[in-house]
């Protein structure tokens, strides 16, 4: 009887190329935004446009990170899960740049004004809370932290993303004055991803039960 043929594992070169494509895809929006800023194509209010697009890309990448596990399960491509860390770190970078642009360009590092905004403007309060919760996730994203904390504790900490994303959606919704469709769409995507997780969890539990 012939032995079953083993699946050929991707080579290191293939892995490197895929990682390179993921990095390029995550970095491309920032490069395009920088070019548009240099070319004066950010509209009548370039500062607001810059701040908003950085934040929106941060939110998009957070949602992409949450979508990787469902995509890996549905497409039967478990190796996709390896890219969650890279996507998550890029999401943090975009959110950090969003905050830096707001504090540095819009407020000229006026910390007193920032504190007033946090206390008096709900969308700033929610956005700052979401960013503060993102920091420990970015810091503990390495394998070393998984070992130090233990897989269970590390996983519990990183479930904060399930709070961070709705905070980001609410921040965006309260920020916009006219077209609320984008934050509503992002919120709907988040709800769909959470419903999939509930369904998948119940399906897995029913399979494991006697």
Swiss-Prot record:
It is a multi-pass membrane protein. Its cofactor is FMN; heme b. GO terms for cellular component: plasma membrane. Keywords: Cell inner membrane, Cell membrane, Electron transport, Flavoprotein, FMN, Heme, Iron, Membrane, Metal-binding, Transmembrane, Transmembrane helix, Transport. The chain crosses the membrane at residues 15-35, 89-109, 122-142, 160-180. Its main location: membrane. It is found in: Cell inner membrane. Part of the MsrPQ system that repairs oxidized periplasmic proteins containing methionine sulfoxide residues (Met-O), using respiratory chain electrons. Thus protects these proteins from oxidative-stress damage caused by reactive species of oxygen and chlorine generated by the host defense mechanisms. MsrPQ is essential for the maintenance of envelope integrity under bleach stress, rescuing a wide series of structurally unrelated periplasmic proteins from methionine oxidation. Belongs to the MsrQ family. This is Protein-methionine-sulfoxide reductase heme-binding subunit MsrQ. It comes from Caulobacter vibrioides (strain ATCC 19089 / CIP 103742 / CB 15) (Caulobacter crescentus). The lineage of its organism: Bacteria, Pseudomonadati, Pseudomonadota, Alphaproteobacteria, Caulobacterales.
